[in-house]
From Swiss-Prot:
Binding positions ([2Fe-2S] cluster): C122, C196
Encoding gene (name): ilvD
Family annotation (InterPro entries): Dihydro-acid_dehy_C (IPR042096), DihydroxyA_deHydtase (IPR004404), DiOHA_6PGluconate_deHydtase_CS (IPR020558), ILV_EDD_C (IPR056740), ILV_EDD_N (IPR000581), IlvD/EDD_N (IPR037237)
GO biological process, one term: isoleucine biosynthetic process
Organism whose genome encodes this protein: Ruegeria sp. (strain TM1040)
Protein name stated in the entry: Dihydroxy-acid dehydratase
Modified residues (N6-carboxylysine): K124
């Protein structure tokens, strides 16, 4: 039977000093012997997805204590990708994932905590904490801050519709809108606390936490502002004590992260991601999380799943006027998982933190089949329509649920948006280890695209050349040396894709990069090209005017240059060194250099790899 980790610092004469310090934090004699639960919070006033989390850690802590545990809270950093976007701040976003994972490991191992409740929300925070959870392999429950309510606009020059952050970015670069109209969109795009309202990276990852079995039902879709979300936090506090005692005191199996998030669970999570057209960043993060848990889940597995899982749900930015609040009304993640299960595309026998099996959980929480009033009540939680930064500030209810699986927000396999899923892996001579495209956001007319390369040595150059009209219809904009090492930090390319839209080129151009894309990206945007240019990838050999052939249905991408020419270019590049032609105006700090030194390519999740970690 496993012993509580915390006994290392709470028992024995040699730990008198440690116990003295524990007492100074408020612990008493009766607390020594109880499980110590780390409340891993990520509150910050910099990020709307985290601004409301300040008091929630202590709310969970009180619940832990009532259930018989000892709760100790600490905080991690949290970078807002939207605020860091478009300048050198974005260099820090992906590396912050590793910092978060390390900081959680440092705190939990240094203080010998027995279990964790991870309070995350936005882009790199959830995956960073998940990496730590798989690395530590102690009982854990994830509970996120929840999605933001969608913004709403109604102005003369635009149709009345729901909006989000990406709409504000596109509008700002459009010459068809007045300054006043742009300001109106800006003021209404992000009306409440929470993670941005579409199926962007943050919400995608919080949904995947449900599919991995590490979060409670409703985690990915219950709005940050709704009072129902409070129950998720309270239940997380109670449940973590229960499963911690079952693990340590009863030696019960199937309760640790690596026993829950198995290979089959990763297949479930990826199938969900493909079915809902989630962010391409989730590929990067799932690979990294699997790596930490020593799960052999690869790009080849993702490619295999992408060929058989249909697109069952389209959410902004892949479709207008559908946001996370609409997914919630349609039954949330367990309704999508239910449709996958009925299509024979889900592993139903994997455990979760709240149920013995995924199949059992679906039977209880999928509103299309479950006669469960609690589920029906949960998924009626509606937006409040009032600007606020406060969690649980409203209790509005939808009058009815969306259970239309023919034409609703969530579809059955028979009535899918497409039988081809929302994400695809492409391979070819320009991406020998693969690259990723969110097919749910690609217009059907350009699933096959051949164009001339317009090469940019940085995101900054691409933005300038798009806005100044140098990029023309038919171009494939190639942005290189923006990978994990080359950036360093693998920046998101949301501004270039948004500006292509604003210039009316969204269906006339492709964008190809060894960097990555925001979850807010749509269009023919292909990222994660591996190997990256800085590692000697073929993307570093592309020249202006080269023909690039993209064939999504056949999962291929090809640089139409003969092998002899490529070999000559490679020899020349080897001699010059794999770096941008012109020196970039970019300050690369010691911290970023350290990340770049160890970072792997996107095909391996951009994790750090030591020489003995091969």
């Amino acid at each position: 039977m496993p012993m509580y980790r915390s006994r290392t610092s709470t028992h024995g004469r040699n730990m008198a000093g440690a116990r003295g310090l524990w007492r100074a934090t408020g612990m008493t004699e009766s607390d020594f012997g109880k499980p110590i639960i780390a409340i891993v919070n990520s509150f910050t006033q910099f990020v709307p997805g985290h601004v409301h989390l300040k008091d929630l850690g202590q709310m969970v802590a009180r619940e832990v204590e009532s259930a018989g545990g000892v709760a100790k809270e600490f905080n991690t950093i949290a970078v807002d990708d939207g605020i860091a976007m478009g300048h050198d701040g974005m260099l820090y976003s992906l590396p912050s994932r590793e910092v978060i994972a390390d900081s959680v490991e440092y705190m939990v191992n240094a203080h010998c905590a027995d279990a964790m409740v991870c309070i995350s929300n936005c882009d790199k925070i959830t995956p960073g904490m998940m990496m730590a959870a798989m690395r530590l392999n102690i009982p854990v429950i994830f509970v996120s801050g929840g999605p933001m309510e969608a913004g709403k606009i109604d102005i003369d020059s635009l149709d009345a519709k729901k909006i989000d952050l990406v709409d504000a970015m596109v509008a700002a670069a459009s010459d068809k809108l007045t300054d006043e109209e742009v300001q109106h969109i800006e003021e209404n795009a992000c009306p409440t606390c929470g993670s941005c309202s579409g199926m962007f990276t943050a919400n995608s990852m919080n949904c995947l936490a449900e599919a991995l079995g590490l979060a409670l039902p409703g985690n990915g879709s219950t709005l940050a502002t709704h009072s129902d979300r409070k129950q998720l936090f309270l239940e997380a506090g109670r449940k973590i004590v229960e499963i911690t005692k079952r693990h340590y005191e009863q030696n019960e199996k199937g309760l640790l992260p690596r026993e829950i998030a198995t290979f089959e669970a990763f297949e479930n999570a990826m199938s969900l991601d493909i079915a809902m057209g989630g962010s391409t960043n989730t590929v990067l993060h799932l690979l990294a999380i699997a790596h930490e848990g020593k799960v052999d889940f690869t790009m080849q597995d993702i490619d295999r799943l992408s060929r058989k899982v249909p697109c069952l749900c389209k959410v902004a930015p892949n479709i207008e006027n559908v946001h996370m609040e609409d997914v919630h009304r349609a039954g949330g993640i367990f309704s999508i998982l239910g449709e996958l299960s009925r299509a024979g595309l889900l592993h139903n026998d994997v455990p979760t933190v709240h149920s013995d099996s995924m199949g059992e959980a679906i039977a209880h929480w999928d509103i299309a089949v479950a006669d469960n009033q609690a589920a029906k009540d949960l998924f009626k939680a509606a937006p409040g329509g009032v600007r606020t930064t406060q969690a649980f500030s409203q209790s509005n209810r939808f009058k009815d649920l969306d259970i239309d699986r023919k034409g609703g927000v969530i579809r059955s396999k028979e009535h899918a948006f497409s039988q081809d899923g929302g994400l695809a892996v492409l391979f070819g001579n320009i991406a020998l280890d693969g690259c990723i495209v969110k097919t749910a956001g690609v217009d059907a007319s350009i699933l096959k695209f051949t164009g001339k390369a317009y090469v940019c040595e940085s995101q900054d150059q691409a933005v300038n050349d798009i806005l100044t009209g140098k990029v023309q219809a038919g171009d494939v904009v190639v942005i290189r040396y923006e990978g994990p090492r080359g950036g360093p930090g693998m920046q998101e390319m949301l501004y270039p894709t948004s500006y292509l839209k604003s210039k009316g080129l969204g269906k006339d151009c492709a964008l190809l990069t060894d960097g990555r894309f925001s979850g807010g990206t749509s269009g023919l945007s292909i990222g994660h090209v591996s190997p990256e240019a800085a590692e000697g990838g073929t993307i570093g050999l592309v020249e202006h005017g080269d023909t690039i052939e993209i064939d999504i249905p056949n999962r291929s991408i090809h640089l139409a240059v003969d092998e002899a020419t490529l070999a000559a270019r490679r020899a020349a590049q080897d001699e010059k060194g794999w770096k941008p032609v012109a020196k970039r105006k970019r300050k690369v700090s010691t911290a970023l250099k350290a990340y770049a030194l160890l970072a792997t390519s996107a095909a391996k999740g951009a994790v750090r790899q030591l020489p003995d970690d091969e």
